[in-house]
């Protein structure tokens, strides 16, 4: 089983603004979000298939707890409440499908894939994909 545990620092980010645009976030909020999320700190704790992920930026901190294969409550990147279902897509990759609790919006998901000491986080909203690469601290 892959070990996602540790603290992670972002090395690169592609298409974050485009993702926020696809989610319908207005220009002013996008500018704030892009600036705030330019240097996130991520802490992951793992016990088998149970995960705790804390992501801290200058504007907000999010925490999620989940067990692979069990639905949990989460918020989309733009803060809407959703039900999320994480599954193993491959030996080193978790895919989490998100379903909005209310209202309409793009189909969203995230994946986290471990490649040695690099963690690739992908956010998706319909056909728009944001890729962020992290390295262990």
Swiss-Prot record:
It comes from the Eukaryota. All-trans-retinoate binds at residues 132-134. One of its GO terms (molecular function) is retinal binding. InterPro entries: Calycin (IPR012674), Fatty_acid-bd (IPR000463), ILBP (IPR031259), Lipocln_cytosolic_FA-bd_dom (IPR000566). Keywords: Cytoplasm, Retinol-binding, Transport, Vitamin A. GO terms for cellular component: cytoplasm. PROSITE patterns: FABP (PS00214). It is found in: Cytoplasm. Its main location: cytoplasm. A motif (Nuclear localization signal) lies at residues 21-31. Forms a beta-barrel structure that accommodates hydrophobic ligands in its interior. Belongs to the calycin superfamily. Fatty-acid binding protein (FABP) family. Cytosolic CRABPs may regulate the access of retinoic acid to the nuclear retinoic acid receptors. This is Cellular retinoic acid-binding protein 1. It comes from Takifugu rubripes (Japanese pufferfish).
């Amino acid at each position: 089983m892959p070990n996602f545990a540790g603290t992670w620092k972002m090395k690169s980010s592609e298409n974050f603004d485009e993702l926020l645009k696809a989610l319908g976030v207005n220009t002013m909020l996008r500018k704030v979000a892009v600036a705030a999320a330019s240097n996130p700190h991520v802490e992951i704790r793992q016990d088998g298939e149970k995960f705790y992920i804390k992501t801290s930026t200058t504007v907000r901190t999010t925490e999620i707890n989940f067990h692979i294969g069990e639905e949990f409550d989460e918020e989309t990147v733009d803060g809407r409440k959703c039900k999320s279902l994480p599954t193993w897509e491959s030996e080193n990759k978790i895919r989490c499908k998100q379903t909005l609790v209310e209202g309409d919006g793009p189909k969203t998901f995230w994946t986290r894939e471990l490649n040695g000491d690099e963690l690739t986080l992908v956010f998706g909203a319909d056909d728009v994909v944001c890729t962020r690469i992290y390295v262990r601290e």
